[in-house]
Regions:
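Helix-turn-helix/homeodomain-like alpha-helical modules used for DNA recognition
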Residues: 2-5, 20-23, 222-235, 239-243
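DNA-binding recognition helix and immediately preceding turn/loop
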Residues: 144-188, 210-218
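Short, Lys/Arg-enriched N-terminal segment that forms or immediately precedes the first helix
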Residues: 15-18, 131-139, 182-186
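Amphipathic alpha-helical segments enriched in hydrophobic/aromatic residues interleaved with Lys/Arg
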Residues: 87-153
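N-terminal regulatory/effector-sensing and dimerization cores
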Residues: 2-93
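Localized chelating/binding microdomains
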Residues: 54-55, 66-67, 77, 148, ...
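Terminal helix-turn-helix DNA-binding modules in bacterial transcription factors
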Residues: 163-164, 183-224, 228, 244
Length: 244
């Protein structure tokens, strides 16, 4: 079990394909597409449990996955405020099952990606965009407040930037900016920065082949235990059991 096939990263999201142990209840900050290549799995949301071959979960919602042994599973985590990600946002549904045709098309895209030696960020981004198009063909894009969109770009492109700096850049009070940020993203500024640290650490592990400890520091965590807790809260499994 816990056989990792391939992991990819890009600015707009990441992909994991492999075998995993059942997850604990967790809450991820990204939009998540989960699908199985060879067997159905059990998904548990806030108030509902289903058995499915594929589904999409909204950001900041609780979810739990249970699989049969040797189930080959894929997770596509999509940043909701970059590129086409916003076309998948749906405030009315915590999750939605994929139709059979969507699951097949996405599985085919992912298998082609798995079978190539290219693991560049550019290819991962192209794969994610192609997957999004399988689901969001006619969905109108949800527009985010331009000040928050600009602030999110600054958060990702800056080593360190705090709430007061972003409030000042946007010419509003810290209180107003903090409220606006949560209103637009669904989470606090502090929670979003923690999400960014997690993704930066994962990139160091997968792309730079760094150790968990070194990657935790590279992402901005004060120590590895903090990284481990954040990872478990986001993915429902410990890092040592899902990334190598």
């Amino acid at each position: 079990l816990n056989k990792q096939i391939k992991i990819g990263f890009s600015k707009i999201g990441g992909i994991y394909v492999g075998e995993l142990e059942n997850s604990k209840l967790h809450k991820h900050r990204a939009i998540t597409i989960a699908l199985s290549f060879n067997d159905k799995f059990e998904f548990e949301g806030e108030n509902q449990k289903i058995t499915t071959s594929g589904l999409i979960s909204q950001p900041n919602t609780n979810r739990k996955y249970n699989y049969n042994p040797n189930t080959l599973i894929a997770f596509v985590h999509i940043e909701p405020f970059f590129s086409l990600g916003s076309t998948l946002l749906n405030k009315d549904k915590e999750f939605e099952e994929l139709v059979t045709e969507q699951t097949k098309e996405i599985a085919e895209i992912l298998m082609q990606w798995c079978n190539t030696n290219d693991n560049s960020e550019k290819l991962t981004e192209t794969v994610i965009e192609n997957i999004i198009k399988q689901i969001a063909t006619e969905t109108p894009q949800r527009f985010i407040d331009e000040r928050i969109k600009k602030s999110i770009d600054l958060i990702w492109n800056s080593e360190q930037i705090d709430l007061s700096e972003l409030a000042s850049i946007n010419n509003i009070s810290i209180y107003r900016f903090s409220h606006l940020f949560k209103q637009e993203t669904g989470i606090s500024f502090k929670e979003y920065v923690l999400h960014k640290k997690l993704i930066k650490s994962l990139q160091a592990i997968v792309t730079d082949k760094e150790t968990l400890t070194t990657s935790a520091y590279m992402g901005g965590f004060s120590d590895q235990p903090h990284f481990n807790r954040t990872y478990l809260n986001a993915f429902g499994v410990p890092p040592g059991k899902s990334i190598k």
